[in-house]
Amino acid sequence: MTTSSYFLLVALGLLLYLCQSSFGTEHTCEPGASPHPQGKCGPELAEFHETMCEVEESLQGGTDDARKKRGRASLLRKRRGFLSMLKARAKRNEASPLPRAGRGIVCECCKNSCTYEEITEYCPPVTEGSG
């Protein structure tokens, strides 16, 4: 084996190790797992998610324009409807005999304690008209 091939093999091994260690921190949930003591569940999770999305939106350049605030109320109603739809889907998935992927907002923030970055992954993308 030549020196460059050996170096490439070592570099590839280090890269794989780094990828594995960074992806190893994902939350996973077993069916029937109990909530984390610092986790947020149910209406508390929905309210926390909504608040964190508003914070993220303002950090990304949201404004306090009154016209946009009126539009925000309907966006919040849509978010609440979306969360209700997700809850209904989660209940259907719990009844399913097939195992589901153990990652989602409930897994990350109720069954585990989530970070700001983790909960804002579930926020809708910020567009120019949503600030």
Swiss-Prot record:
One Gene Ontology CC term in the entry: extracellular region
Keyword Signal applies: yes
4-carboxyglutamate-modified residues are where? 118
Provide the alphabetized UniProt keywords: Amidation, Carbohydrate metabolism, Cleavage on pair of basic residues, Disulfide bond, Gamma-carboxyglutamic acid, Glucose metabolism, Hormone, Secreted, Signal, Toxin
The compartments listed are:
Secreted
Q: Which residues form the propeptide?
A: 59-92
Q: Any idea which residues bear Serine amide here?
A: 130
Signal peptide positions on this chain: 1-24
| Gene Ontology terms: biological process | glucose metabolic process
Q: Which cysteines are joined by disulfide bonds?
A: 29-107, 41-110, 53-123, 109-114
* Origin superkingdom: Eukaryota
The UniProt GO MF terms for this protein read: hormone activity; toxin activity
Tissue specificity here reads:
Expressed by the venom gland.
Kindly give the InterPro entries that the UniProt entry links to this protein: Insulin-like (IPR016179), Insulin-like_sf (IPR036438), Insulin-rel_pep (IPR016724), Insulin_CS (IPR022353)
Q: Which Gene3D superfamilies match?
A: Insulin-like
Per the record, the major location class is: secreted
Similarity comment text for this entry: Belongs to the insulin family.
Q: What does this protein do?
A: This venom insulin facilitates prey capture by rapidly inducing hypoglycemic shock. Intraperitoneal injection of this peptide into zebrafish lowers blood glucose with the same potency than human insulin. In vivo, when applied to water, this peptide reduces overall locomotor activity of zebrafish larvae, observed as a significant decrease in the percentage of time spent swimming and movement frequency.
Cite the record's note on assembly: Heterodimer of A and B chains; disulfide-linked.
Instruction: Please state what the protein is called.
Output: Con-Ins Q1b
Source species of the chain: Conus quercinus (Oak cone)
Phylogenetic classification of the source organism: Eukaryota, Metazoa, Spiralia, Lophotrochozoa, Mollusca
